[in-house]
């Protein structure tokens, strides 16, 4: 009997495969060594309420502002990386923000891995169930969440828009925001202001409305439209001016012929049904949610058809973590997002969000005087905001200016 023994697997191809398997095992071994590497543990949090006066007293449709309170935080990890976060508290109430960070939310983060963003968000939200879910406590949560994203993007060595997964890499579309009420400001002055933004390259601009009578507001809108021409998107911000749908329609009927891009915040934020009724009575898109907290509020807006455009603010709604959830939900309803205020944080979010349309851009620090507190400004080019390319948000606080308007307090273990 003849026995034939055949040997397999010793050719060139098999040798190559063995080398590849060894290389993979080596690579896995290297990756597994991360368990012994430094993990970014949150070591300390600094909090400050900065009280910054406006250069000129400025009016909206239903209130006048002379001072702004900003909530600032710095979250530092054991590897020496620092992330910053911030929010607008209001014309008062900075002390509430500081207390929320020091006593309620900050201690939740200390000693934790900064990468656990979803879990940390849930822990902070749970801790604030009795005191928060809206208002200043939710804004404090938002600021801390923003700081975590900034910290983690810096740790990864990526600008925030790339860390999030960018749609746009260099610039994002923006509209110039202004048109506030000032003593002695005429419709002609308003028109000149709007035209000046177009001269700077913006193809979309926004003005305030709702403070004056329907006839007077129509005159302001007419002057603005004639100044910018028919091809520039012209937005109108009511700042919750109207009390009911009947009153709103007295204005809207006069506005429709000038084709504004949207009507913003016609009613108070909690009057969702009136937003929905107005949306059914006019072809003009209704924009709202800049003071909206949490995904559940936004879902009700969407379910009732109360918003054609969401203006969700990451420094209000629950931070970048919650903003991303809300934007994704809006996309499933076919609704676009044009986030409110704070172009410094919203530019990278718009860059990473398919259904985000515009960044609201303030070209000076008269109204958004938060600009005085940061060490580097976003720039614009041909109506688009130029994204920072440095890791994280791409800027920090101007400590000299922060010291002028507030004082840091440290929260540590």
Question: What are these regions, as identified by a protein language model?
Answer:
Residues 20, 31-35:
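Low-complexity, intrinsically disordered or signal/transmembrane-proximal segments
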Residues 42, 80, 144, 157, ...:
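Conserved, mostly hydrophobic/aromatic
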Residues 165-282:
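Metal-dependent enolase-superfamily TIM-barrel catalytic cores that perform enediolate-based chemistry
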Residues 44, 76-155:
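Metal- or metallocofactor-binding catalytic centers and their adjacent structured scaffolds
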Residues 103, 253, 259, 270-384, ...:
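Shared catalytic-loop signature of beta/alpha-barrel
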Residues 38-84, 88-90, 366, 371:
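Structured beta-strand/loop patches that form or line metal/cofactor-binding pockets in enzymes
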Residues 2-3, 12-13, 22:
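Polybasic, lysine-rich low-complexity intrinsically disordered segments
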């Amino acid at each position: 009997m003849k026995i034939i023994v055949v040997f397999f697997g010793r050719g060139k191809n098999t040798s190559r495969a063995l080398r590849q398997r060894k290389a993979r095992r080596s690579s896995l071994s290297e990756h597994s060594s991360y368990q012994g590497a430094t993990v970014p543990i949150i070591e300390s949090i600094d909090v400050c309420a900065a009280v910054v006066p406006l250069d000129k007293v400025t009016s909206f449709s239903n209130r006048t502002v002379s001072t702004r309170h900003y909530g600032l935080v710095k979250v530092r990890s054991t590897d020496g990386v620092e992330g910053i976060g911030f929010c607008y508290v209001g014309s008062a109430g900075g002390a509430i923000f500081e207390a929320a960070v020091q006593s309620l939310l900050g201690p939740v983060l200390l000693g934790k891995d900064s990468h656990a963003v979803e879990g940390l968000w849930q822990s902070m939200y749970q801790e604030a169930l009795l005191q928060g879910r809206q208002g200043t406590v939710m804004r404090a949560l938002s600021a801390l969440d923003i700081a975590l994203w900034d910290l983690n993007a810096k740790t990864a060595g990526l600008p925030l828009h790339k860390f999030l997964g960018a749609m746009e890499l260099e610039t994002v579309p923006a509209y110039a925001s202004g048109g506030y009420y000032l003593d002695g400001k005429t419709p002609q002055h308003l028109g000149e202001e709007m035209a000046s933004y177009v001269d700077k390259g913006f193809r979309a601009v926004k003005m305030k409305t709702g403070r004056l009578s329907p006839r007077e507001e129509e005159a302001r809108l007419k002057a603005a439209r004639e100044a910018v021409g028919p091809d520039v998107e012209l937005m109108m911000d009511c700042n919750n001016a109207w009390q009911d749908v009947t009153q709103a329609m007295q204005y809207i009927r006069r506005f429709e012929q000038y084709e504004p891009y949207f009507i913003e915040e016609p009613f108070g934020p909690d009057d969702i049904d009136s937003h929905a009724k107005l949306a059914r009575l006019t072809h003009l898109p209704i924009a709202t949610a800049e003071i909206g907290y949490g995904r559940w509020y936004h879902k009700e807006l969407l379910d009732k058809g109360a918003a054609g455009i969401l203006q969700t603010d990451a420094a209000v709604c629950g931070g970048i973590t919650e903003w991303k959830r809300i934007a994704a939900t809006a996309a499933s309803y076919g609704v676009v997002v044009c986030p409110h205020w704070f172009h410094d944080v919203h530019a990278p979010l718009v860059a990473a969000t398919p259904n985000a349309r515009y960044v609201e851009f303030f070209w000076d620090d008269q109204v958004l005087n938060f600009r005085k507190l940061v060490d580097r400004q976003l720039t614009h080019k041909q109506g688009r905001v130029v994204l920072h390319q440095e890791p994280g948000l791409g800027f920090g606080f101007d400590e000299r200016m922060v010291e002028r308007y507030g004082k840091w307090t440290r929260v540590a273990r």
